[in-house]
């Protein structure tokens, strides 16, 4: 069974709105074992929407549309669908009542054009919308299925989850299950080289590498009749990848590096502090994304100036004068200083040049020294990151967290 997504709306076509619905629906369809090879975006124009329907049904069994269910004249998805299937638009009394109740409850005046949203193609199944006024519909005709959903994600997603997914599950004879392998420390090309034979031999499961802003993710996907059967296909491939890539694999579930580090700190009952210069508090901010981090995170300091490094962390002025703020020596003193003054077992520190100005031939933009202190031992890593200011800060943050992870798992 093949599906195709059609996003309807001139605002999407012009780039005024990001089509996040397509990403969500693609992932959900894959999880249901429904193949999808095409997506379309079309403006609010009857002829072009009709053409999009023709194109989709020439290669797919199911069309899922989003958008064009509002009360205005350019919201024409249901009208075009009714014409396409040669059906009349009729009033759905339950939908009309719900629309009226929606406005009455909010003490707002309902204009006549809102009643347009209660019209559905004759014979269609109504999909209730508990978060807005536009119901969706399912049309089945001559072995064709069309599922029409509203554009706002806060309305579309619950409708898909509560009504469309169970409907599609009954029609699918298999499911897709995916697991992710998250990697730091080596690039996409190096990862691909390490597992080239696995990628070349893939059938079921499949292996798909993705380069992220920082790091690489592999998605392993298997198709089977049940989830357990799919997982049995995935597990040996996942284990082989972990064996080959070693400590570069930081997670085999969809979690971020800060959550991995937070879990390790809590598990080992190690307290942590941070002192950041070029990252400006980003490491601390990432860590406190994790609920429960307050058990171990005691303090975060942003020590941007030399004075702050000296006064708050106790970095020796002689070291600052001799080696400069951006140096291995300063990073070492920062790591020791924040751990000592905050009385923590662990610390992460950064000092560097994020740019776009401030670099020299000796110390270019992107140069960052990252220090990790763990119970008396300091590890320093010299890094040269590429990209704009925010990219440098992000790479330094992720690298610092990954340095600590690698130490804690030894």
Swiss-Prot record:
- InterPro entries from the UniProt entry: CinA, CinA-like_C, CinA_C, CinA_KH, Competence-induced_CinA, MoaB/Mog-like_dom_sf, MoaB/Mog_dom
The protein's matches in Pfam families, at most eight in alphabetical order, are given as: CinA (PF02464), CinA_KH (PF18146), MoCF_biosynth (PF00994)
Under HAMAP family, the record lists: CinA_B
Q: Which PANTHER family match?
A: NICOTINAMIDE-NUCLEOTIDE AMIDOHYDROLASE PNCC, NMN AMIDOHYDROLASE-LIKE PROTEIN YFAY
- Which family does the record claim for this protein? Belongs to the CinA family.
Q: Show the NCBIfam families listed in the entry.
A: cinA_nterm, molyb_syn, PncC_domain, PRK00549.1
Identification of the protein by name: Putative competence-damage inducible protein
Q: Which organism is it from?
A: Clostridium beijerinckii (strain ATCC 51743 / NCIMB 8052) (Clostridium acetobutylicum)
């Amino acid at each position: 069974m093949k599906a195709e997504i059609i996003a309807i709306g001139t605002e999407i076509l012009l780039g005024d709105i990001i089509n996040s619905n397509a990403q969500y629906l693609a992932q959900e369809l894959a999880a249901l074992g429904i193949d999808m090879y095409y997506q379309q975006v079309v403006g609010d124009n009857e002829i072009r929407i009709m053409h999009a329907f023709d194109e989709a049904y020439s290669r797919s069994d199911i069309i899922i549309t989003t958008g064009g269910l509002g009360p205005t004249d350019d919201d024409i998805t249901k009208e075009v669908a009714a014409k396409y299937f040669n059906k009349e638009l009729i009033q759905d009394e339950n939908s009309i009542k719900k629309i009226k109740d929606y406005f009455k409850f909010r003490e707002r005046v309902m204009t006549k054009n809102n009643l347009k949203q209660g019209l559905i193609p004759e014979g269609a199944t109504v999909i209730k919308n508990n978060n807005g006024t536009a119901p969706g519909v399912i049309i089945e005709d001559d072995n064709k299925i069309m599922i029409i959903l509203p554009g706002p994600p806060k309305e579309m997603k619950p409708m898909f989850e509560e009504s469309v997914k169970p409907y599609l599950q009954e029609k699918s004879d298999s499911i897709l299950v995916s697991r992710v392998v998250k990697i730091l420390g080596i690039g996409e090309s190096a990862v691909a080289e390490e597992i080239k034979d696995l990628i070349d031999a893939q059938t079921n499961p499949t292996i798909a590498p993705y380069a992220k802003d920082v790091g690489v993710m592999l998605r392993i996907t298997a198709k089977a009749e049940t989830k357990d059967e799919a997982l049995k296909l995935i597990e040996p491939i996942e284990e082989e990848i972990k064996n080959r890539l070693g400590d570069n694999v930081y997670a085999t579930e969809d979690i971020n590096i800060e959550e991995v580090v937070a879990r390790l700190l809590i598990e080992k009952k190690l307290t942590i502090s941070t002192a950041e210069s070029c990252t400006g508090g980003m490491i601390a901010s990432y860590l406190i994304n994790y609920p429960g981090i307050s058990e171990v995170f005691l303090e975060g300091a942003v020590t941007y100036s030399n004075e702050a490094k000296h006064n708050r962390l106790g970095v020796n002025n002689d070291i600052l004068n001799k080696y400069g703020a951006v140096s291995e020596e300063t990073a070492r003193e920062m790591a020791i200083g924040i751990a000592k003054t905050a009385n923590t077992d662990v610390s992460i520190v950064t000092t560097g040049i994020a740019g776009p100005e401030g670099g020299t031939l000796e110390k270019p933009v992107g140069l960052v020294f990252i220090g990790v202190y763990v119970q008396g031992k300091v590890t320093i890593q010299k890094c040269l990151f590429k990209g704009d200011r925010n990219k440098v800060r992000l790479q330094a943050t992720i690298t610092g967290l990954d340095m600590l992870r690698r130490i804690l798992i030894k």
